[in-house]
Amino acid sequence: MPLRVELKPFERIVIGQSVITNSDTRTTFLIDGDAPILREKDILTAETANTPVKRIYLCVQMMYLQNDIPAYQDLYLGFIKELIEAVPSFRETIEATSNHILSGNLYKALRELRPLIKREEELLSR
């Protein structure tokens, strides 16, 4: 079953190695295949990955977009070790994220991390 994607005017999306920018009207299209897909709002850059959880998210994002877990594995393991030592309450989510990575479900790993980014922001704002 194809993935249905609706883009707002000028919204961008990454499909595989390509960035697609929508024109000035709302657009809907269907995507068949297994290329990595991320909406602009879900993409972090090196500049925006400025917290421990965001660095982990960026690492998993690169695994996903480049389809290369081993290239980022050591970096990921270092980041999660530091995070769990600093915030033990994040362990359960990090374990679930790691299980998704181990089973090759990188998009699910990213989805698992998104609420953790919000929790981290709440902790940092105190």
UniProtKB/Swiss-Prot annotation:
The keyword Repressor applies. One of its GO terms (molecular function) is mRNA 5'-UTR binding. GO terms for biological process: bacterial-type flagellum organization; mRNA catabolic process; negative regulation of bacterial-type flagellum assembly. Keywords: Bacterial flagellum biogenesis, Repressor, RNA-binding. It comes from the Bacteria. Pfam families: FlbT. InterPro entries: Flagellum_FlbT. Belongs to the FlbT family. Has a post-transcriptional repressor function in flagellum biogenesis. Associates with the 5'-UTR of fljK mRNA and promotes its degradation. This is Probable flagellum biosynthesis repressor protein FlbT. It comes from Rhodopseudomonas palustris (strain TIE-1). The gene is flbT.
